[in-house]
Each structure stands twice: as C-alpha cells, then as structure tokens.
C-alpha cells in the first residue's frame, strides 16, 4: 500500500512539473516594451497610423476652416496621442468603399460626417490627404490637406513644481487646397506633382508642383 501511494505522489509531482514547464513556455507572455517616440514617428510617416491604427479622422478634421472664414486654419497642429485617446473622438470610424476613413457624429442636432483618404507622400515627409465633410445640408466640402509629422517637447510641472519634458508626436497642417462642393475631378499624385483632373470647377487638368 505504501508503494502504491508513493507511485501516486511521484506521478502527481511529475505531471505538475510538466504542466508548469508548459505554462511557462507557452502561456506566460513576455511583457512588451512601449514603442519609442522614434518608432511612433516612423510608423506615422510610413502608414499615417498611430500604434497600429489609422489616425482618427477627427484629428484631421481639426484643420478644417469654417465656411465663413478663409485659410489658414485656426488649428494647425494636433497632438496625435492626446487626440486619439480623447473622449471627444471615442466613436469608431469606418473605411468607405472608395477608401475614405471617416466617422459620423451629431452636432446641434444635425448629423455630420468627415473623412480623409491618404493620396500619398511627397519629399520632405508631406502627406497628401483628400478630405470630404458634410453636415446638415447637401453640401460636401472637399479639401486637400498637406500634413507633416514631427516630434516636439512638451513641458509639464507636478504639484512639487518638478519639471518633466516629454517628446510628443505632432501632426501639422502646412497647406491646403479647396476643391469645392462635390468636386467630380480626379486627384492623383505623380512624382511630386499633385494632378487635379477636369471637373465642374476646372476646364483643364491642373498640376501643382509640391517640391
């Protein structure tokens, strides 16, 4: 009887050891390091994304100019992390069949929409974004934004007035082209030239050099 109990204990100990070994190898994930600010900047420049997700269209919408005003926009720089993690842009976005990353929201009881499509990137790290916005009526305002990413220092003080300096990813609007209401013309980026096709606003193709 003692021999039998000894065998049972040995078998139980062996199974327990094997289970722990397997758990340590397969089920216990190694903690992942947070990406450096340099990696974050690299991803933004490569994919117009932040930590694996497309930048929320609400962040790009900050560059919009009120119809009653003229450019440049009041807001020309956006802290990307603060924007994508804010309560203001908690809602999901969707990608339309024609490639626009957009979202819908209500403002003063009216349904609004804003979306952007990355046309490409030119020299100097300038991203070309074709955008469309609507709200409350039939107008669909179409605007091309020129955006560029960079790192900037942000200084903050705690309750003991200790200074902390943190590098942040900043998206800046460095230019824009108004296309008008529901422009039907094509939009292409050829080398460093932005080519706007014929439309109800243009009788011939227009080429804008972005060098």
List the predicted regions and their residue ranges.
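Acidic, small-residue rich beta-repeat scaffolds with periodic aromatic anchors
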Residues: 20-86, 152, 165-211
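Signature of short aromatic-glycine-proline-rich micro-motifs recurring in repeat-based ectodomains
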Residues: 103-117
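Short consensus segments that form the blades of beta-propeller domains
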Residues: 105-108, 133-139
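Structural signature of eukaryotic scaffold interfaces centered on beta-propeller domains
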Residues: 117-123, 186-190
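Short beta-strand elements that form the blades of beta-propeller/WD-repeat-like
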Residues: 125-133, 193-198
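Structural motif
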Residues: 137-146, 202-209
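Short loop/turn segments immediately following beta-strands, especially the blade-tip
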Residues: 149-159
């Amino acid at each position: 009887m003692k021999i039998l109990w000894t065998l049972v204990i040995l078998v139980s100990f062996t199974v327990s050891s094997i289970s722990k070994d397997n758990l340590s190898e397969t089920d216990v994930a190694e903690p992942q390091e947070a990406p450096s600010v340099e990696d974050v900047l690299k991803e933004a420049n490569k994919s117009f994304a932040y930590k694996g997700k497309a930048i929320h269209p609400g962040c790009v919408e900050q560059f919009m100019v009120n119809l009653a005003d003229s450019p440049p926009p009041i807001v020309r720089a956006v802290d990307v992390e603060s924007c994508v993690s804010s309560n203001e842009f908690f809602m999901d976005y969707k990608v339309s069949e024609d490639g626009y990353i957009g979202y819908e929201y209500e403002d003063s009881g009216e349904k609004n929409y804003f979306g952007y499509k990355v046309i490409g990137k030119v020299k100097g790290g300038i991203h070309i974004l074709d955008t469309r916005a609507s709200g409350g009526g039939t107008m669909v305002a179409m605007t091309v934004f020129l955006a560029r990413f960079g790192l900037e220092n942000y200084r903050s003080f705690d309750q003991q007035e200790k200074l902390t300096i943190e590098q942040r990813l900043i998206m800046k609007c460095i230019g824009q082209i108004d296309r008008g209401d529901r422009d039907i013309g094509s939009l292409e980026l050829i080398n460093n030239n932005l080519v706007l096709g014929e439309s109800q606003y243009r009788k011939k193709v227009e080429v804008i050099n972005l060098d």
